[in-house]
Amino acid sequence: MSIIKHAVISAAGMGARLGLNMPKCLLKFSGTTIIQHQLELLKDIEDVRIVGGFMEKDVIKVVKSIRSDVVFVRNPHYQDTSNTYSISLATKGLKNPHILVDGDLLINKKSFLEFIDSFDGKNSLVGVTNSSTDDAVYVEIDDKDKVINFNRNVKSKYEWSGIACLNNIIVD
């Protein structure tokens, strides 16, 4: 994991479809919040940034009790913007490879480490899966297995899985 110097967790959304009136990153599985699980996976990364918006004070409180050095980036427009906007706020000025993680992603440690280890630092690595949801961020892949587009409108065979390792590209 040494080539990755920064991590961004996008946790600004309202999680409205769940209907629980709480950020999805604060949901507990086996007694541990998703954000706590993610911070454990990212413990060796020195610069962790979390984008907050909805109920951000609750997220900050939980995160600070786990890791005090996390940088919080506020998305004041979380109700009207996409995950991409949140990511663009947190990645401004990053000059080294970084990992992006959706705040609602619960990932197996072994799978996470395999994903990180497969990142060479030269080419971006984007986690995709076969499309299976109705409200997916669909991913278009070219004939060389490179991601060429993300969108919510045009269904495709693949969807964004919520994780990516990027090398000095601009997200806007």
Language-model features, listed with the residues they occupy:
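Residue-level signal for inorganic ion chemistry
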Residues: 35, 59, 104, 139, ...
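Conserved beta-strand segments of alpha/beta enzyme cores
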Residues: 25, 47, 69-71, 146
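Short beta-strand/turn micro-motifs composed of small residues
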Residues: 11, 52, 102, 128-129
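N-terminal glycine-rich phosphate-binding loop and ensuing alpha1 helix
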Residues: 2-59
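Short phosphate-binding loop-to-helix
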Residues: 61, 65-98
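Short beta-strand-to-loop acidic/aromatic patch adjacent to the donor-nucleotide binding site
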Residues: 96-106
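Conserved core of the sugar-phosphate nucleotidyltransferase
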Residues: 108-172
